[in-house]
Amino acid sequence: MPVVSLAQMMESGVHFGHQTRRWNPKMSPYIYTSRNGVHIIDLVQTAHLMDEAYNYMRSQAEQGKKFLFVGTKRQAAGIIAQEAARCGSHYINQRWLGGMLTNWATIKTRVDRLKDLERREESGALDLLPKKEASMLRRELAKLQKYLGGIKTMRKVPDVVVIVDQRREYNAVQECQKLSIPIVSMLDTNCDPDVVDIPIPANDDAIRSIKLIVGKLADAIYEGRHGQLDVEEEYEDYEGAEDDYEYDETEYTDSVIPDDEEEAE
């Protein structure tokens, strides 16, 4: 029995790709046809690759491997955080900071700083400081929690990285390649399947599609670690984001925590 059925994928809109003019020819083997100027993904292949990805993730989890989920587009952010937490994995869902993996030693110092500030906040130590100093430290804490909260318990680079939208997360892909970290990734019709280890052709813009695919991958990790799955949950929190979000060519990443002016932009 397949991990995900064709009916489930159809209902979630997994088969809808991008406009034909925006495609990557390397995705041609995974495209079934085009309708009204939009590519339609071959769900038979998606189902097969989902089985492969599920079995791989479950096997890695059984061996005690660590996983990092990456998805910074707004449709994916909430799903990434909740599913990663559900299966006991790490995640990045705001911005990929340059050197997140390749310069892990430096990033870890910021993670340690986050933990230190959290301890000081919880103990009430910040309340004993002058108001201006305490305010500055709380602002720093909020930024660190926003960008590094999902990897707070990560002690070393992950063994496997799961990505939503390979094209958008190209910096993460490059760092994984440099470190030979396996990549399991959702790929829309504008992506490059050659740069990932297990491609999952799927609509990476629609909330329901992301929820279905990422949820199944989280299931695989949970099953590998615990031997069985919990009752499937519904995630109503993501209904506020639009499914027709377009990829923003101007997205960028920094190797430092963004300052207030950058966040305002």
Swiss-Prot record:
Gene Ontology terms for molecular function: structural constituent of ribosome
Keyword S-adenosyl-L-methionine: no
Signal sequence coordinates: none
Record GO biological process: translation
One GO cellular component term: cytosolic small ribosomal subunit
Disulfide bonds: none
InterPro entries in alphabetical order: Ribosomal_uS2 (IPR001865), Ribosomal_uS2_bac/mit/plastid (IPR005706), Ribosomal_uS2_CS (IPR018130), Ribosomal_uS2_flav_dom_sf (IPR023591)
Keyword annotations from UniProtKB, A to Z: Ribonucleoprotein, Ribosomal protein
Pfam families, per database record: Ribosomal_S2
UniProt region (Disordered), positions on chain: 231-265
Family: Belongs to the universal ribosomal protein uS2 family.
Protein name, UniProt field: Small ribosomal subunit protein uS2
Organism of provenance: Trichormus variabilis (strain ATCC 29413 / PCC 7937)
